[in-house]
């Protein structure tokens, strides 16, 4: 039961307010590939937090936007215990809508692995 709580996705690990998003957009490192752009900013010790900015410009259909969000949240949830205290905003590119779930998850897992190794000594 304890392991389930540690791998949950509570409100504390999400960016929820516009001012939190503004801080990340104003001062962040960018990393990206063909499907995603991640904005990463060190935070003040609150642990890793995730924000999603999946626009209609990227994925026209609501079903596609929700599938992208679901994959991002799930991979973040599994990997967040290995990450340093960073705020992350994930944005997508139009190419990602043609990807299947396995391709999306593989791309995101590469980002999470890079973040866990590059953020150990910020």
Model-derived features: positions:
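Positively charged, solvent-exposed patches that mediate nucleic-acid binding
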Residues: 1-122
């Amino acid at each position: 039961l304890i392991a389930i709580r540690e791998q949950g996705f509570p409100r504390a690990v999400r960016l929820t307010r516009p001012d939190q998003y503004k801080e990340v957009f104003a001062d962040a490192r960018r990393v990206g590939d063909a499907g995603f752009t991640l904005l990463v900013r060190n935070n003040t010790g609150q642990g890793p937090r995730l924000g999603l900015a999946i626009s209609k410009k990227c994925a026209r259909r609501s079903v596609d936007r929700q599938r992208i969000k679901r994959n991002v949240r799930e991979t973040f949830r599994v990997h967040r215990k290995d990450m340093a205290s960073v705020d992350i905003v994930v944005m997508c590119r139009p190419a990602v809508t043609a990807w299947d779930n396995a391709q999306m998850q593989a791309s995101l897992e590469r980002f999470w692995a890079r973040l866990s190794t590059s953020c150990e000594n910020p």
